[in-house]
Amino acid sequence: MSDEQTRPDRFKDRKVPVPVPAYLPSAGSPLAVDKDVYSSIQQAPRVLVNEFTLPIRSGRAWEAPAGSIVRITTPEGPQVGDLNVWNLHNPSERFWASRTRQLHASHLSTYDRLWSTLPYLRPLVTILSDSLSSYGKDINGGRVHDLLGTRCDPYVNSVLSSGAQYDFHCHSNLVRAVMPWGLQERDVHDVLNIFQVTGLDKEGRYFMSPCPAEKGDSLEFLAETDVLMALSTCPGGDLSLWGFGADSEAEMIKVCRPLHVQVYQLEDKDFLANQGWKPSEPAPYRGMHGMKVPEGENNPRTASR
């Protein structure tokens, strides 16, 4: 590189325009839900159809049919959870954290949607309510319900902790959780870290802050299609004692608490249809990425091969 390229003040006087979000929703865009409709769905009478408490440092999966409401709460106080979502009938369609981050924000809240991978690209679930929505941006730049990071896993733990072996990181908890549905480790994917506060420091480095949730805080989702969801109660608990090393798991268990999951159906089975709601559909792109597929060996386009 030239001296000019390495000059410390090279970009000192560069004028940078005020940035505009890359994906601003237009009228009728699927990025901008009808808040009146979704608010009415959240407030409509509902019937409990499934309920369980997820113990500390464990994982569990459950089904949520299209139109059902999933409520996740902190029954005993602050606790971080790592959430995965799949199309119930096709696990190759799963939550796409990075695209969701682009379409919405680095941290999610009410009316944001969890989008699926290509070639499907549709909302799997939409956040109906968030009791921590008022948290906003704290003095360190942290926000809640994180999409910047991903799940903790035994591989990075072994690398950073001199070969330490621990089997109950969120990745492992999710792997065990989905096995009864025929899914494997490769099906576990980047997560939505619910109730987790994160951000980037002045050097652009990822940080985590203690969970702000209190007893009874909640996050609710509307299933936009039939989904399989899986949740891990993070072994870091509320992250107030987060760390790596031989003693880290023994320390962090002191701040671990359960999470509670409830699945509801609306009492009025026609309510969603009357509101104009329909299950989400895959992206309408039907092209071939510029390719032409031959009809057979006698096709003129392939005769020279």
PLM segments and residue spans:
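Acidic, Ser/Thr/Pro
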Residues: 2-305
